[in-house]
UniProtKB/Swiss-Prot annotation:
It comes from the Eukaryota. Probable transcription factor. SUPFAM superfamilies: Homeodomain-like (SSF46689). Keywords: Developmental protein, DNA-binding, Homeobox, Nucleus. Residues 262-272 have a biased composition (Pro residues). In the embryo it is detected in the posterior hypothalamus and later in the head. In the adult it is detected only in testis. Residues 188-247 bind DNA. One of its GO terms (cellular component) is nucleus. This is Homeobox protein Nkx-2.4. It is found in: Nucleus.
């Protein structure tokens, strides 16, 4: 009975290793274009697969390895190789030249299945800091100024960030320094001095006696109540103004109170003037003085009988036929003349003619 199967299945060792070899060859070109310090060691350490060939197959069959176990082991190796290739590609496109993200020994141990050296992996920031320094050195060249070397001794790992932050703080400090003279130039308001009750009492007592003090009197009063002459002078000025304002407010209040009792009564209207209207005819008879109301001088006298005016008698003479030898006719003529004269005189006065 032969140990090798008659018909090969797709799960044989050669079928599994052939795509891995193609993948390795494909990424081999990328590794050849990688930096010198990264390509060869990483490529050698990343791929640790057993050699493929008839001898390896025979050894596997002789050892009694079943196809599923072999497939699982080689799948792990393939996954490790793919991860290493992806890391190499990422390092090629994202990392500066000459910088390796992981040590080759640690990567080799990981690909071989050992996890004991994972603690030896350096921090990511250390690699980035070293890469940035290497890139800066390659781009700008080494700086020989001794001042920069002395400064670099005092700068910590996060020097770039701190310098940026200190730049903003420096700007704020400069602005504060520029504003400082403005605040110093502004005049400061003096603190208000509070007098004691004894001092106020003495000042008020002296103010009642004398509202204006001379310089010697002011100095003497200030020495008595333990104040400065300037304070006494200012207090007297303020108190004089206060008294004047209080007097003015009091006078205005009194006027308001007096006006609140009631408005003053309006002056009585002037009495209508009595104008004497002359009455020419009263009870059908003309008046003598032409006034209907007696004058003050005539108040106690009896009104006299009206007599016909001579001019009216001349205007209305009695007819000649009536003047005869008979006395009765003469009396009648006289009476008729009197009555007719009175009526005629009234008609003439009112502008009517009969």
């Amino acid at each position: 009975m032969s140990l090798s199967p008659k018909h090969t299945t797709p799960f044989s060792v050669s079928d599994i290793l052939s795509p891995i070899e193609e993948t390795y060859k494909k990424f081999g070109g990328v590794m050849d274009g990688a930096p010198p310090g990264l390509g060869a060691p990483l490529g050698a350490a990343a791929y640790r697969a057993p050699p493929s060939g008839p001898s390896s197959q025979a050894a596997a069959v002789a050892a009694g390895m079943q196809p599923p176990h072999a497939m699982a082991g080689h799948n792990a190796a393939a996954a490790a190789a793919a991860a290493a290739a992806a890391a190499a590609a990422a390092a090629t496109y994202h990392m500066p030249p000459g910088v390796s993200q992981f040590p080759h020994s640690a990567m080799g141990s990981y690909c071989n299945g050992g996890l004991g050296n994972m603690g030896e992996l350096p921090a990511y920031t250390d690699g980035m800091r070293g890469g940035a320094a290497a890139a800066a050195t390659g781009w700008y060249g080494a700086n020989t100024d001794p001042r920069y070397s002395s400064i670099s001794r005092f700068m910590g790992p996060s020097a770039g960030v701190n310098v940026a932050g200190m730049g903003s703080l420096t700007g704020i400090a400069d602005a504060a320094k520029s504003l400082a003279p403005l605040h110093a130039a502004a005049p400061r308001r003096k603190r208000r001095v509070l007098f004691s009750q004894a001092q106020v009492y003495e000042l008020e007592r002296r103010f009642k006696q004398q509202k204006y003090l001379s310089a010697p009197e002011r100095e003497h009063l200030a020495s008595m109540i333990h104040l400065t002459p300037t304070q006494v002078k200012i207090w007297f000025q303020n108190h004089r103004y206060k008294m004047k304002r209080q007097a003015k407010d009091k006078a205005a209040q009194q006027l308001q109170q007096e006006g609140g009792l009631g408005p003053p009564p309006p002056p009585p209207p002037p009495s209508p003037r009595r104008v004497a209207v002359p009455v020419l005819v009263k009870d059908g008879k003309p008046c003598q003085n032409g006034a209907g109301t007696p004058t003050p001088g005539q108040g106690g006298q009896q009104p006299q009988a009206p007599t016909p005016a001579p001019e009216l008698e001349e205007l209305s003479p009695s007819p000649p036929a009536l003047h005869g030898p008979g006395g009765g006719l003469a009396a009648l003529d006289a009476a008729t003349g009197d009555y007719g004269g009175g009526v005629l005189g009234a008609n003439l006065l009112y502008g009517r003619t009969w």
